[in-house]
From Swiss-Prot:
Keyword tRNA processing: no
UniProt organism field: Synechococcus sp. (strain JA-3-3Ab) (Cyanobacteria bacterium Yellowstone A-Prime)
Keywords: Cell cycle, Cell division, Cell inner membrane, Cell membrane, Cell shape, Cell wall biogenesis/degradation, Glycosyltransferase, Membrane, Peptidoglycan synthesis, Transferase
GO CC terms of this entry: plasma membrane
Entry EC no(s): 2.4.1.227
Reactions performed catalytically: di-trans,octa-cis-undecaprenyl diphospho-N-acetyl-alpha-D-muramoyl-L-alanyl-D-glutamyl-meso-2,6-diaminopimeloyl-D-alanyl-D-alanine + UDP-N-acetyl-alpha-D-glucosamine = di-trans,octa-cis-undecaprenyl diphospho-[N-acetyl-alpha-D-glucosaminyl-(1->4)]-N-acetyl-alpha-D-muramoyl-L-alanyl-D-glutamyl-meso-2,6-diaminopimeloyl-D-alanyl-D-alanine + UDP + H(+)
Protein known as: UDP-N-acetylglucosamine--N-acetylmuramyl-(pentapeptide) pyrophosphoryl-undecaprenol N-acetylglucosamine transferase
TM spans (from-to): none
Function: Cell wall formation. Catalyzes the transfer of a GlcNAc subunit on undecaprenyl-pyrophosphoryl-MurNAc-pentapeptide (lipid intermediate I) to form undecaprenyl-pyrophosphoryl-MurNAc-(pentapeptide)GlcNAc (lipid intermediate II).
Enzyme class: transferase
Binding site for UDP-N-acetyl-alpha-D-glucosamine: 21-23, 129, 170, 198, 290
HAMAP family for the chain: MurG
Involved pathway(s): Cell wall biogenesis; peptidoglycan biosynthesis
Cellular location(s): Cell inner membrane
Amino acid sequence: MNGDRRDPTSPPRLLVAASGTGGHIFPALAVVEQLPTWQIEWLGVPQRLEAKLVPDRYPLHRVAMSGWQGSPWQKLGSLVQLARATLQVRQILASGQFDVVLTTGGYIAAPTILAARSLGVPVLLHESNCLPGKVTRWLGRFCRLVALGMAETAEHLPGAVTRVVGTPVRAEFYQPQPLPADLPIPEGDPLIVVMGGSQGARGLNRLVAACAPAWLEAGAWIVHLTGGSEVGIPSHPRYRAFPFRADVAALLQRATFAISRAGALSLAELWATATPAILIPYPFAAEDHQYHNALAFVGRGGGVVMRESEANLDLLRQTALAWLAQPQVVAQMAANLKATAPPAASKAVARLLQEICRDSAR
């Protein structure tokens, strides 16, 4: 396809294939913000999160695609759907004369990688998780490059060309942010930020609700991002609950520590702000990948990991109380994260896309 390119002096054209959850979409958005002169279009799946986030910024193409779970007959149907989606993506790529593709994995990545390979369009695949997803494991070798959020991922991708870059987060996570005016937390008071995540927040919220009275009694403020799930703890002037907030960067920069799920994007935000964390992985994540993410984060000296269980209720309560009582321990964990944090990954991935375009034009 590249042999029939349009005017070579025109801006590079990028197709972004990122769909479903914030963990797939927000890193891609952070990357394309670094490419203001490029012509960018987006590929997603109908009725997913990208339908709310993307159309005001970039043209959005939609292709039906789902996962591989289910009976043999359902899997056969998935193969038929994959073939149909690959042909649709091939048509989008050919008619749009795209120079390069960026995908962040997930369902939409499979037809995108296959279609791009059939046309000779180079693909940069970014994998945020420590344990890569099935599409990355199966098709990473067909990509020009697989950019990794964590170094540990490379061992799972034999045959793929990999580069460790970190996981892209929005620029504000690297820039000092003022604490929002609606959170009048006095300087020096400890702050615990709880991030339930967009999926499976209910179990984590239940544990935190049971522990919060002890932390409040110890003098902490708690900002609890519930993900929309009810938590039901008594009202308290130093406890603030919100379904979501857009100013997570400011909260994490101010936090003493966080209590969080272990999605790759959440960990990247904690890493970028050097925020120590008690990690409670979502127990129903595919292939338990959040637990693997958490182990990688903890291995850098940034916190502890515990399973979601009522049996761990007292462990969670006492761990947070110990951290509140030992600020020097928390400070050391923050220093560990600062020392191991990669540079801004969004810029690194943008540079890799630029390199791929230059190499392909030769």
